[in-house]
C-alpha cells in the first residue's frame, strides 16, 4: 500500500474466487431473545430444483489512495455460469480494467494466488497482449501480476470479507433460490448485480478470450 500511496494513478487489487453455498450454514454468533436461540436449519435440495447447490463468484478488493490522503476501498463481484476457469478469469479482468480507467487509474497491482485459472498460459498471454496494447495506445490500465506464496490464502485480505459476507447472507430456516442468494451477496458487498460471467456477450477485439482454458 505504501507503493500505491506514492503513485496516485495506481490501484492495489486483491483477487480471489469463492463458492456461495445454498446448503452449508456458516458458524456465527447472533443476538436473540431469552430462551429463543437462533437455530440454523440444515437444508436439502429438492429433486426438481433447477438451481446449482453452490454459486461461484469472482471478486476484486480494490484499494487506492484518495486525493485527501485517505485509503479508499471497494469490492467488485461477478458470479459465474459454472466454475472458475481461465476464460472467466480473462472476462473478469477485462471487465475490471475499464472500471479502473474510469476512476483515473493507469496500473493495477494484481495480488492473487497460484490457482490454475490464474497462472495458465491463456491468462498470462492475455495479460501480456493487454499490456502491450495499453503501452501502444497510451490508454487503459496496465496489469502487474503479484503472486502470493503457494498455499497461503490467508495473506489475501479479501478472504475475511468472504467469511463475513457468508454470515451476513445466511437464511436460518429456508433454502435460498440462486437469484436471491446472488442478490443478498451483492447487497452485503454494496455492489450492483451484473450478468453472469460465461454468458455469450460481445467483446472488444483485443479482449477476445483464447480458446485454451485451465
What is each stretch, according to the model?
Residues 88-109:
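Short, basic/hydrophobic alpha-helical segments
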Residues 1-95:
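Extended, low-complexity cationic-aromatic segments
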Residues 36-48, 130-160, 173-175:
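RNase H-like polynucleotidyl transferase catalytic core
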Residues 9-10, 142, 151, 155-214:
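C-terminal anion-handling pockets and recognition modules
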Residues 23-26, 120-124, 158:
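A short acidic (Asp/Glu
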Residues 16, 105-119, 148, 156:
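Acidic/histidine-rich, metal-coordinating catalytic segments
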Amino acid at each position: 500500500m505504501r507503493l500505491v500511496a506514492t503513485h496516485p494513478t495506481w490501484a492495489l487489487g486483491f483477487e480471489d474466487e469463492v463458492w456461495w453455498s445454498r446448503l452449508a450454514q456458516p458458524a456465527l454468533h447472533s443476538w436473540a431473545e431469552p430462551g429463543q436461540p437462533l437455530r440454523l436449519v440444515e437444508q436439502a435440495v429438492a429433486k426438481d430444483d433447477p438451481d446449482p447447490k453452490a454459486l461461484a463468484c469472482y471478486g476484486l478488493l480494490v484499494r487506492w489512495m484518495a486525493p485527501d490522503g485517505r485509503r479508499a476501498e471497494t469490492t467488485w463481484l461477478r458470479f459465474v455460469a459454472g466454475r472458475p476457469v481461465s476464460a472467466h478469469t480473462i472476462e473478469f479482468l477485462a471487465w475490471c480494467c475499464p472500471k479502473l480507467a474510469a476512476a483515473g487509474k493507469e496500473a493495477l497491482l494484481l495480488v492473487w494466488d497460484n490457482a490454475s485459472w490464474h497462472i495458465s498460459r491463456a491468462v498470462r498471454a492475455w495479460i501480456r497482449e493487454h499490456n502491450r496494447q495499453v503501452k501502444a495506445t497510451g490508454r487503459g490500465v496496465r496489469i502487474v501480476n503479484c503472486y502470493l506464496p503457494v498455499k497461503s490464502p490467508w495473506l489475501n485480505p479479501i478472504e475475511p470479507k468472504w467469511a463475513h459476507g457468508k454470515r451476513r447472507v445466511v437464511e436460518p430456516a429456508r433454502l435460498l433460490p440462486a437469484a436471491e442468494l446472488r442478490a443478498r451477496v451483492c447487497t452485503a458487498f454494496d455492489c450492483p448485480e451484473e450478468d453472469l460471467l460465461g454468458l455469450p456477450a460481445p467483446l472488444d477485439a483485443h479482449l477476445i478470450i483464447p480458446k485454451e482454458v485451465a
